[in-house]
Every structure is written in structure tokens, then in C-alpha cells.
Amino acid sequence: MKKSSLKRIAAFLCAVACAGSFLLAGCSSSGGASSGGADSGESSSAPAASVDLTSGPEVDLTFWHSMGGTNAKALQTMIDEFNTKNKGHIKVTAQFQGNYDDAINKFKSAMVSKSGPDIFQSYELGTRYLIDSGFTDPMQNYIDRDKWDVKQIDANIAAYYTVNGKLYSMPFNSSTPLLYYNKDAFKAAGLDPEKPPKTLEEIISLAPKLTQKDASGNATQSAIGMWAYGWFLDESLNKMKKPSFDNGNGRTGAPAKVAFDSNGGGAAYLKAYHQLVESGAMPKYAIDADNARSAFVNGKVTMYVESTAVLASLLKAINGKFELGTAYFPGVDDKVSTGGVSIGGASLWMMKSDDARKQAAKWEFIKFMVSPKGQAFWNTKTGYFPITTEAYNEPVFKENVKKYPQFQTAINQLHDSSPESAGALCAIYTQVRKIEETEMQKMLNNQQTEDQALKNMTDQINSALEDYNASNAK
């Protein structure tokens, strides 16, 4: 989920250049909320039954987002389409707020001064905070009012943003981690390029065949690059069907402490991840995100773990130098890693307000953004999953998957998971991830043992949770 994000394309989708105006249907006006309301409480009262936005002044909405580059262009295309369809009734203005961490920090400050956005795109790490903040108006209020069919959202995607049966935000740009691999390197090593490894244990066993050295004994090609990312720890716990935190993984209540220390999941992942470096399967430089990507693109490592959302940009960067393969996110081993993955990425949040016209306008915009045609367009331009299942039936989506079959792996992995793999919620998740990543890096650099890394993670995260819960007790 990271954060940040996922990530983009040009060559990936020349096939859909003709999709510039995707003419989304069923998005007429109806509207309203005040810019950045600061009401307290988990949810607002039931929204007004109906609001006619075809009369009265145009409703202006401010939309804060964290999309850059190609993603930002695709986003603006969608917004322009919406504004054209609703001219004179609703106008949405997009404002880039930097990466996800920057955006949520700005959001916290702005909402206190009542100068925040009407609609806010935030990463999955911000979910628990935004639910608890009292600033947001749950999507479930509008779903229930309009009897909007929530089943049109992929269940495995909706699960992350659903707590106690209530969908709080609308999934928008969703992704999961994948194993990317160099099929040509597999062939050269005498390995079947259609049978990629499924676990870290298997990757370690294959590493000698994928390793090449120069006359001095230095590795010129290694097996894998997998950076020290807290998301990969979380996903490994999901694959093991073990929670990251107590209190239902942060879903039945605010987490008070981590669970990965006592359930064995943390130790299992740290041992397997550390062994990648210790065995020589992964060069130490490849524990860095940029280095891991560069090494893979340039043939210095044969496998690379990253988000599904980088598929497009990888294809562009590789530019035909080798055939790119995709596989499911690797578990620790085939004995414990029998579960699925949860989604990362971001969702759309509606701010609370007493202005019924603004609330209705926000709801219309959000429905537009997740319509089948809109999500098919968004997928082909960015590489994020379509969150709406009907988007899979759109011609532009089918054409794209046919041209880039690697993306089918991401779809299959998502559908082979289950809502039970929804993932954890934590109001200080960004801080948690930083602690995890710092301690993993120290372990990989031989500054501490696996046991010390696990203890340091546990102690620091539990202390941070205690401080947060004490200062936010209701």
C-alpha cells in the first residue's frame, strides 16, 4: 500500500491511445459538502434523500491527490470528462499534494483549520486514521441511501476499506505485489521460464543456477532484488494467514500491540529474507528500492519484487531487452505460506459537511471515477487494478490484457486471495513501516541479528502505539 506509489507508462499503452475520451455513462449531477468540514465523530447522519443539481449555482469541489506523471495526466483526463458532462452543475478542481505521506500531513493541518479538500485520495496506510478522525463521511451512507450495488466492487479490494460491514472510502487505485522475472535469464540457466519460483525458499535453491561471476569471483548476475519494504513483511504475514496486530489486525479496534512477534510470522519472514542475502541470492545493494529496480532492468538480477502498478513502467524501461515474466508474490515457504495477499494503493474519501448539494456532487464524482468505463480507462493508462468488476468486460481492458498478458497474473493473484486476507489497519502505519524498514536494513547490514531486529521492531512499534492510543483516548 504504500505508499506511495505505484507507479508509469507510455509504451505500455499506446494500444489505448484512442481511448482519450471514454464517455462514461450514468454520471449526471446530484450534490454536496463544505470544503473540509471538521465535524467530529465516526460518521455523519444519513444523507438527504435526493438533491437536484441541475438547478441552482454550480457546485465547486476541491480534490486533493498524489498522482504524478502519466498517472496525473490520466486522472486529469477523467476529471475533464466529468466536468464537461456536468458543466454548469459541478466542477472538480484537482490539486496535487505531493506523495502520500506529504498529502496526509497536509490534510491533518488543513482540516483543523477547515481549509482542506472536499475529496481526498489517500493511501491504504491512512485508512484507520481517516476513519477515526471524524472528518470523513463513509461511502456506506450513500450506498445504503441509493441502494447502490456494492457488489460491483471487487470483494477482495473492498474488503480492505470495509470495517464492521461499512465501506468507509471508495477504492480507486489498487495494487498488489508481484514477482517479476527475466524469462531469458531463466532459459539461459536451463530453468523452465513458465515455472517461476513460488517461495523465498525456492528462490534461494535456484540462485546458484542464476548467478554469474567474473574472473575475480564477483557476481555480475544475481538471483533477486527485493528491497527492505514493510509492505512485503505485511504481505508475507497475509500469506501465512497471521495478523500484524492484535484486535483483529486493527479491524475490531485500534491496535494496542503487534502480533507478529508472538505468532511466529515476523521471525519466519526475517529469517527467510535475511537468508536471501546470506546465501548470495541477493546482492546487498539490492535491498534499496531504486537499486533493486535498476539492477533488474539492466540484467544484474533476474528477479524483482514490486507492486503490480509498476508493470507498465517496467515494460517501458526494459524496452525489449528481455522477455518479462510475472508471478505471484513469493511466500516464505510452501508449508506456511498458503494464504493470499491484500491490496495496496489508495482510495477516495468524502469529507463531511452539512451542505447537501456538495455531498451529492461528491458522490456523483466518485461514482463516475469508479464506473466500468472509467476504471477500464484508468487501468490501461496506469496499471492499477480496475476496482469495478464490470471493467473487465470493457473492450479497451480486454485489448490491453491481450497485448500485455503479464497483467493477467496480477488479476489471478487478486482473485485467488480472499477478503479474509484484507490486511491490517493502524492509525500510525507510516511510522510502523519506517521502524520495520530501519530494523530490516540493520539486520541485512550485519548490525544486528534476526532476533534483535524482531525485538527492536516490536518494542518500538508497541511503544509508539501506546503513545498514540494514550493521546487519542476518547
Identify the residue ranges that each predicted region occupies:
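Extracytoplasmic "Venus flytrap"/periplasmic binding protein-like
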Residues: 81, 85-153, 187-190, 195-198, ...
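Extracytoplasmic/periplasmic solute-binding protein
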Residues: 163-172, 177, 187, 201-257
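A structural signal for short loop-to-beta-strand junctions that line the ligand-binding cleft
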Residues: 109-110, 118, 149-186, 221-222, ...
